[in-house]
Amino acid sequence: MYYFASDVHLGAGDEPTSRRTERCFVRWLDMVSADAEAIFLVGDIFDFWFEYGKVVPKGFVRTLGKLAELTDRGIKVVFITGNHDMWSRDYLQKECGVKVVHTSRTITLGKRTIHIAHGDNLNIGDKPLLRLMNSAFRSNILRKLFSNLIHPDLALCFGQWWSGKSRKSHANETITPQSLQFLIDYARGYKQQHPDVDCLLFGHMHYPHFHSEENLDIAFLGNWSESEGSYAVSDGEGNIELKNFR
């Protein structure tokens, strides 16, 4: 089986809340490891993540240990970064055996082709400020300045504050199926350019939803909390099903 999850936002909220969310996520990793051939983490697993040459953020040891355990057992884990953890470098790969991917990824399961993306920087051509911020935060120059000029304690505190500010700015928004339309439109355009693709799978929107139309399925993964999370599972034939974990 193939499993997909996103938007756990480990480290969000106060320490007890973050710890409960992490334990919930680790229980899910335990459960799916029973029959998983591969696990795809589709961005924003961490609320903020930044790596220096010798320094990584404090915490998340249960998650990191579990990921290392799973890859040691031969389970493939692929981490497609999101807008909150785009500055991942090689730590997760070297220490935990996780394959880190900074762009979208296309896989084939059976006769179906599935395109996987976090979804944060798609279909934003009419939003110049968002495009500018996206380019800036993904800039290698900014990453090097951040890592070379700012002490890790200050950098991580700032990053956690910024991530929390960004998340809270959307906290009162009501997400509906209509909120997903810009990514549905993107998926339709992608299908036209890549007719072999049968399904697109996104995170980012914090709203689990499955949209199906002729020759195209679109799955949105949803997010995680202290006691539950949504995820997708696919068999070897590429059939996608959204599920809830408690």
What spans do the regions from the language model cover?
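Core catalytic region of metal-dependent phosphoesterases/phosphodiesterases
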Residues: 5, 10-109
